[in-house]
Amino acid sequence: MALTLTDVKRIAHLARLEMADADAEHMLGQLNEFFGLVEQMQAVDTAGIAPLAHPIEQIQEVAQRLRDDAVTEVVNRDDNQRPAPAVQDGLYLVPKVIE
């Protein structure tokens, strides 16, 4: 997939970005390099490779810095909502901002 200068300008317009022609050409080169890298990664055959939940789990010499989650304190909803200006049925009431 290769973008054109028209594509870059259209994307900038949709994102409401002002972009000079020189900047658009520079961005075109960077985006096409990125998409080229993505195409190279997609071409790699990964059929026999199991997915990793975390890449460090495959390195035996590196100690896991992850620990099991443990409850350290109980959250009391009433205590947390006491300073709120308005609550109802355990939910915070906020002013309407979109009509």
From Swiss-Prot:
Q: What is this protein called?
A: Aspartyl/glutamyl-tRNA(Asn/Gln) amidotransferase subunit C
- Function summary: Allows the formation of correctly charged Asn-tRNA(Asn) or Gln-tRNA(Gln) through the transamidation of misacylated Asp-tRNA(Asn) or Glu-tRNA(Gln) in organisms which lack either or both of asparaginyl-tRNA or glutaminyl-tRNA synthetases. The reaction takes place in the presence of glutamine and ATP through an activated phospho-Asp-tRNA(Asn) or phospho-Glu-tRNA(Gln).
Q: Which Pfam families match?
A: GatC
Keywords noted in UniProt: ATP-binding, Ligase, Nucleotide-binding, Protein biosynthesis
**Is Nuclease given among the entry's keywords?**
no
Q: Which GO biological process entries does UniProt record here? A: glutaminyl-tRNAGln biosynthesis via transamidation; regulation of translational fidelity; translation
Question: What does the annotation say about its assembly with partners?
Answer: Heterotrimer of A, B and C subunits.
